[in-house]
Design a protein with these regions (language model features):
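Substrate-binding/charge-relay-adjacent region of secreted/lumenal peptidase catalytic domains
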Residues: 37-133, 139, 144-330
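Bacterial N-terminal signal peptides
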Residues: 20-31
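Sec/Tat signal peptide C-region and signal peptidase I cleavage site
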Residues: 32-36
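Bacterial N-terminal signal peptides that target proteins for export
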Residues: 2-22
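Short intrinsically disordered, low-complexity coil segments enriched in acidic
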Residues: 1-2, 330
Length: 330
């Protein structure tokens, strides 16, 4: 999914650990043991747009930022082989999905490496605000001054070239005086914010629009029609399954119950899971969040629960993905 997408939908059988495999695909790198704490330089943290922009000013050293520091997975070749075997009908590991504990033991960063990262953060004035059981991510917060010192960079403020706002970004790639390899640091910039790709267009009310034959009022389409179009004749309803949705906005529960009533669908239990503080005020993109929930119910009317993982925009994607994998609820 593109960086501009507002959400990700993950649907998978209860108890399986496919979400950890998703993280594997996103974060696989071969760990290289190093001796002394030589300075390592990371890559991919400076937005390309800053190459042609001049900083408006430097961020205040007293301002706080939340960061998610990611460690690489281990045994990359073994993980690739295991992924292939899981989807190979001829393999003895076909559909033999790993538990969270198994995945962490075989491929997750080691406990000593995770503790070394925690010690590095605390030594450099950063506060650990969340740890993850799979040890893939460490969430920290700190002042801009401490972040600049820890990662040997300057946090600058720029005028966004396409949006009516400013954004912050580092002036150089972060580097760390740390012996263990680090994969990525999320949260150093807010140049690209997740947003929906839909575009609202005004309707010319003087023109008589004749909708196609949907099952809704006046022939309008409902989610049920997509189920009939894409999986006609299926008896599968997702009975007893749970679904996890990744969202950067909230929704109004009354919108969902109204849709269920009007579409003749059952009332599905919704469980909100706040990440990085969650959504305190429902925003302008609530319609897309509601649409995702309604589409899941329409396509899988027997679904037992929908877990809605909500995080403020912006928040590190990896925070939500790691939480979903570690919860292992859907």
């Amino acid at each position: 999914m593109s960086r501009t997408a507002a959400n990700i939908v993950l649907i998978m059988p209860q108890g399986w650990i496919r979400k950890s495999l998703l993280l594997a695909a996103l974060m696989v790198v071969t760990s290289v043991a190093t001796g002394a704490a030589e300075r390592q330089t990371l890559h991919g943290h400076v937005p390309f747009a800053t190459e042609t922009l001049f900083p408006r000013n430097r961020m205040s050293g007293a301002e706080h930022l939340n960061l998610a520091i990611g460690l690489p997975l281990r045994n990359a070749e073994m993980l690739t082989d295991r992924l292939q075997q899981i989807y190979d009908p001829a393999s003895q590991n076909y559909r033999q999905y790993l538990t969270l504990a198994q995945f962490t033991e075989m491929f997750g960063p080691t406990e000593p490496d995770y503790q070394a990262l925690i010690q590095f953060a605390e030594t450099n004035g950063l506060t650990v605000i969340a740890t993850h059981p799979n040890r893939v991510v460490l969430d920290v917060t700190g002042t801009v001054a401490d972040i600049e010192k820890a990662f040997h960079l300057r946090m600058e403020v720029y005028e966004h070239p396409k949006e009516a706002r400013t954004f912050h970004a580092p002036d150089a790639e972060p580097s760390l005086d740390l012996a263990i390899p680090v994969l990525h640091i999320s949260g150093l910039d807010n140049f690209s914010l997740p947003h929906p790709n839909y575009k609202a267009r005004p309707v010319n009310l003087t023109t008589k629009i004749v909708p196609n034959a949907g099952s809704g009022p006046g022939g309008a389409y409902r989610g049920n029609d997509f189920r009939a179009a894409y999986v006609p004749g299926t008896a599968l309803t997702g009975t007893g399954q749970s679904v996890g949705l990744l969202q950067f906005d909230g929704y109004y529960a009354s919108d969902i119950t109204t849709y269920e009533t009007q579409a003749g669908l059952p009332n599905v239990m919704l469980v909100n899971v706040p990440i990085d503080g969650g959504i305190t005020t429902v925003g302008a993109n609530n319609a897309e969040v509601a649409l995702d929930i309604e589409m899941v119910i329409s396509m899988s009317p027997g679904v037992a629960k929908i877990y809605v993982y909500e995080a403020p925009n912006p928040s590190p994607w990896v925070d939500l993905l790691s939480r979903m994998a570690n919860d292992n609820l859907a």
